Amino acid sequence: MDPITFKSLIEIEGKHFILETASLTGGTKYSYFIQLDGRIISQKESDFPDGLNNDGMKQYLQNGHKARAVELESIFRLNKKIDEKATPDTCWKMGVIFLSNGFYEDAKNRFLKAMELDSVHLQASKCYGITLMLLGDLEASIAALNHAKDLGPSFADIYYHLGNAYLFSKDLDQAVQCYLQALQINPRYADARLRLGTACIGYLLQTGTGLNDAKTQELAERARKEAETAASLNPKVRNRSFILAVDYLKSKKYQQAYQSFLDVRPKYVPRTGDEIVFYFNLTLLYGNEGIDLQMTEQYVEKLAKVIEEYPQYADLHHHLGVAFLIKCRFDVTRSLKEFQKALEINPQYKKAIVHSADTDDLNKKVLSVLKKIIISTVNN
């Protein structure tokens, strides 16, 4: 099958973005990237849904390309609106949206603004450190993540990302200590176990360490056990790179095993559902026309798909409950309008009089509950 490619030039606030979506060799995957000033600033690769023929793949790519173009414009439009009344939390959430989409420089600026408004904002400090790591500034990343670690309660993910920054800096001793600390807090942290195993292989690549055969075997076995435990905790770990890494490890090809283990998981995996929830909440606050029924239905659909894959997250179920309540608000309003139309036609229609009054009471109750929930959800 010949490659399918869609390409668009998009101008936003004086910036000229090139968006390209294309199928990859083999016909099972596709990728898209966003380019600015000759530099790729965002790039992702995904699988096609099963069962698509050539025409289906083309239509799927075309629809996705159009949707990404709209999303790109809406993200930057929302970002501009936030500047009008910025708060630490809204800047952090906007930064997470940028970070999840690969706009690292824009994310960094948002996290810096959040910390400027609140110097002890833990989440902004953590995400700032992660962003610096993704930008390749490892020394600054380590400093920022250590600062986040010292700000408040111990979180496993802070130690994990700090461990990654040390690992990419070749400071294996510090990396191992961070991964062990993350696992002490959360023993089921699959990615931390995988990186701990990777660090064990890293020791085998160091020159001049004088490791004997017994120590080499011990480190290789520890790497294998940590990797297998990670795969048992999160089946997504057991991908092609994982299988290659294990094979290389068995055949004592440690350099190839090390690189393959690094490739098993991305340097940064957004927290499940955050981008979807944050975008919806920020649009509630800053959108020009607020939230309409179509956007709410799309939000419900996206969240439901995430929950289907990750049913164990209580906060996502809560957000979906809020979304259904917002959707219910549109239905109640529509009911009220229809009762009022009935009364315009026949002001003495008793059923419409009673039902209109009851629905008006329900509408006020729904509005009151939504006001409390949305303020709480957006500001915390």
Q: Where is each model-derived feature located?
A:
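Conserved structural position within tetratricopeptide repeats
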Residues: 113-116, 146-150, 180-184, 228-232, ...
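Position-specific recognition of the canonical hydrophobic site in helix A of tetratricopeptide repeat
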Residues: 99, 133, 160, 167, ...
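Helix-start (N-cap) detector for alpha-helical repeat units in TPR-like alpha-solenoids
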Residues: 88, 122-123, 156-157, 190-191, ...
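Short coil turns that delineate tetratricopeptide repeat
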Residues: 119, 153, 187, 232-236, ...
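Alpha-helical segment of the N-proximal tetratricopeptide repeat
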Residues: 80-123, 127-137, 274-305, 309
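Canonical tetratricopeptide repeat
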Residues: 93, 127, 161, 195, ...
